[in-house]
């Protein structure tokens, strides 16, 4: 949750720098701001459904930020701005930290799931109302990578 909050705190900085150069991307900025607000409002870390909603909102936000990064490629003057370079480097560092935290979280969730599902700890878990938490899936893992056939590139006939 700390790493996600760092990302959410960084997003306004990236958007404010980018807005100066990308006026016609206003709808993207508005969607990102709305998703950020929704994600920040989901703060009950003990409720599995709230955590699942947070992860869902985060996946949408991550996708929108990816879209923004792609559209930034069309603005070489924006990529040349030093503050944007720093913001993007910081954003990438935060994404790397989120990836590491995701692995740690999923490992802990797996251990909890095993404890909740396996007897005798399952009896204790149900008695004190402990439920398994949702896994934090990487939104990038859902994208299907197309297979590249290298022979097509070398076949000139």
Task: Say what each PLM segment does.
Residues 1-157:
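A helix-centric hydrophobic-segment signal that preferentially recognizes long
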């Amino acid at each position: 949750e700390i790493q996600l909050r760092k990302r959410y705190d960084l997003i306004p900085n990236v958007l404010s720098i980018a807005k100066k150069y990308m006026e016609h991307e206003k709808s993207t900025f508005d969607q990102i701001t709305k998703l950020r607000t929704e994600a920040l409002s989901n703060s009950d870390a003990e409720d599995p459904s709230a955590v699942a909603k947070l992860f869902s909102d985060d996946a949408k936000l991550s996708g929108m930020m990816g879209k923004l990064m792609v559209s930034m490629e069309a603005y070489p003057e924006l990529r040349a701005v030093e503050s944007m370079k720093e913001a993007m480097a910081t954003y990438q560092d935060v994404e790397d930290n989120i990836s590491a935290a995701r692995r740690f979280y999923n490992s802990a969730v797996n251990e909890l799931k095993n404890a909740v599902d396996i007897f005798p700890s399952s009896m204790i878990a149900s008695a004190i109302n402990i439920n398994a938490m949702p896994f934090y899936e990487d939104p990038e893992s859902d994208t299907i990578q197309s297979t590249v056939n290298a022979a097509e590139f070398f076949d000139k006939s």
